[in-house]
From Swiss-Prot:
Pfam families: PolyA_pol (PF01743), PolyA_pol_RNAbd (PF12627). This is CCA tRNA nucleotidyltransferase, mitochondrial. The keyword Transmembrane does not apply. Present with 13500 molecules/cell in log phase SD medium. Keywords: ATP-binding, Cytoplasm, Mitochondrion, Nucleotide-binding, Nucleotidyltransferase, Nucleus, RNA-binding, Transferase, Transit peptide.
Length: 546
């Protein structure tokens, strides 16, 4: 659909010949919104004044909108990502002059000057040159000078200096992200000579040779994968082949901060087509570096020498277990979703749920494996390796890490509960309720991850076995809602702790927490029970907790 949209826009839009120093091409015309037109008019007026004042020395001030905005406008999509590249000064210098101009000409534009926020260099966050940010007509606009980059073998942080438009375009991750919009000419500029065609064809290609591009900054691999997933584009076969180069894996580990990996992966996992991205990750054999369990080499080394589960964890990584599991999940996921309209609906409503479910499903080979989270602690220092992958490897939130780890490490116990549920006589309502409370409201993630794990273990041709599996899980899911267990984590004892201690003629102490759990258990099996009936039950079992 997106590709046909591109063709339509690029073929039917008013076209004109655009000339650059080295080549001529036909470029589509971008239609600006009213606000965008106001911004461009202001920038044009200020640029004209500046060039008149300085007589175009050393060269005329020229402004270009860069990157994602140009791509998205050509795709017919709205974009609020407005980055302006400047050729003869820094972003801060330009923004300061523009603000002074606005103060003098407020009546003409009706736009208030805003404070300029300077974003300093921060290479670890991929900010290699300082950027100035301000608001124009209610839109945040970033100003930065055109730049060129030179990399070393040991770092993804380049030496950055002022550059030409060609140099700035060639340093970008993809040709279709290297398109510029010349504000003064109202034209799209394609200094890579391939960006417009690649955008029309839906192809992601690096402006420079792919291997060196990826070795310079391996994050570009993940960015291309994300763009392929977001727009349903293909990656050029030669570029795809270089993604799988073992050298890229090594560079990925040594050059990229886990925070940057996490930012890209979170965008992928909450996006519209995460499966395509996972397929590309699996084909490039990047799963081991993307889903690695820690970013601190000293912690990794300590675990290699002292962790009991390390051989099993390394087996998952080194013997292709994770890659094979990921491949199976990708192949069978469409069939899995087709059978579960409830899951499709839930994923459609909640991108966060989609992220946590997918991570739980693909990390299931790590179930119940632990690492030493803090080598300095002598006791209680074991952490689920799944939790570490999510929290330290992907740098997602503590809550997401806890939910995913609990889900993965409970897959076997969830399957055991389902096996008992198949024979209702073996399972009390309280046993189900107490089990579900362990997930603190996130039991549905565990439910579908457990079903996914069981589903992947059944050969595709054993259709009767598959149907029986889904039937059992669907019946269990319905049972939970029919018996009001879906929010069972919110259930509290009908007698509060203070009153309970008084009625049991006991002083509050450690016993009270255990008795509270027994009260909850009793309430699951006796939903219409009274306070007095509960106290009578608790008196009978109290001695074993003292």
């Amino acid at each position: 659909m997106l590709r046909s949209t591109i063709s339509l826009l690029m073929n039917s839009a008013a076209q004109k010949t655009m000339t650059n120093s080295n080549f001529v091409l036909n470029a589509p015309k971008i239609t600006l919104t009213k606000v965008e037109q106001n911004i461009c008019n202001l920038l044009n007026d200020y640029t004209d004044l500046y060039n008149q004042k300085y007589h175009n020395k050393p060269e005329p001030l020229t402004l270009r909108i860069t990157g994602g905005w140009v791509r998205d406008k050509l795709l017919g999509q709205g974009s609020h990502d407005l980055d302006i590249a400047i050729n003869v000064m820094s972003g801060e210098q330009f923004a300061t002059g523009l603000n002074e101009y606005l103060q003098q000409h407020y009546a003409k534009y009706g736009a208030k000057p805003h404070n300029i926020h300077k974003i300093d260099k921060n290479p670890e966050k991929s900010k290699h040159l300082e950027t100035a940010t301000t608001k124009l007509f209610g839109v945040e606009v970033d100003f930065v000078n055109l730049r060129s980059e030179k990399y070393t073998e040991l770092s993804r942080i380049p030496k950055v200096c002022f550059g030409t438009p060609e140099e700035d375009a060639l340093r970008r991750d993809a040709t279709l992200n290297a398109l510029f919009y010349n504000i003064h000419k109202g034209e799209v500029e394609d200094f890579t000579k391939r960006g417009l065609q690649d955008l029309k064809d839906g192809v992601l290609r690096t402006p420079l040779p792919a291997k060196q591009t990826f070795l310079d900054d391996p994050l570009r691999v993940l960015r291309l994968i994300r763009f392929a997933s977001r727009f349903n584009f293909t990656i050029d076969p030669e570029v795809m082949a270089e993604m799988g180069d073992p050298q890229i894996n090594v560079a990925f580990n040594s050059k990229i901060s886990r925070e940057r990996v996490g930012v890209e992966m979170e965008k992928i996992l909450v996006g519209p087509t995460p499966l395509l991205a996972l397929q590309l990750i699996q084909r490039a054999h990047l799963e081991n570096v993307i889903f690695f369990w820690h970013n601190d080499s000293s912690v990794v080394k300590f675990n290699e020498e002292n962790c009991q589960d390390m051989d099993k964890i390394n087996h998952v990584y080194n013997d292709n277990i994770l890659n094979s599991h990921l491949k199976s999940f990708i192949e069978l996921y469409p069939m899995f979703l087709e059978k579960l309209p409830i899951l499709r609906e839930k994923i459609g409503r909640s991108p966060g749920f989609q992220q946590n479910f997918i991570l739980s499903a693909i990390l299931s080979p790590m179930a119940n494996l632990q690492i030493i989270g803090n080598p300095k602690k002598k006791i209680n220092n074991l952490v689920s390796v799944t939790e570490s992958i999510v929290k330290e490897g992907l740098k997602l939130s503590k809550n997401d890490a806890a939910v995913i780890a609990k889900t993965v490490d409970s897959i076997c116990s969830y399957e055991e509960i389902l096996a008992k549920f198949a024979d209702r006589s073996q399972l009390k309502k309280s046993e189900i309720g107490i089990f579900l409370r362990n997930f603190n409201g996130e039991w549905e993630t565990a439910h579908f991850a457990s079903l996914s794990d069981a589903f992947l273990k059944i050969p595709k041709l054993e259709t009767k076995k598959i149907e029986l599996l889904f039937q059992n899980y669907n019946e269990f899911y319905s049972y939970i809602f029919d018996n009001n267990l879906n929010n069972c984590h919110e259930l509290k004892p009908i007698v509060d702790g203070k009153q309970m201690a008084k009625l049991l003629q006991m002083k509050p102490g450690p016993w009270l927490g255990k008795i509270n759990n027994e009260a909850i258990r009793w309430q699951f099996d006796n939903p219409t029970g009274t306070d007095q009936e509960l106290i009578t039950h608790l008196k009978a079992i109290l001695p074993k907790y003292l």
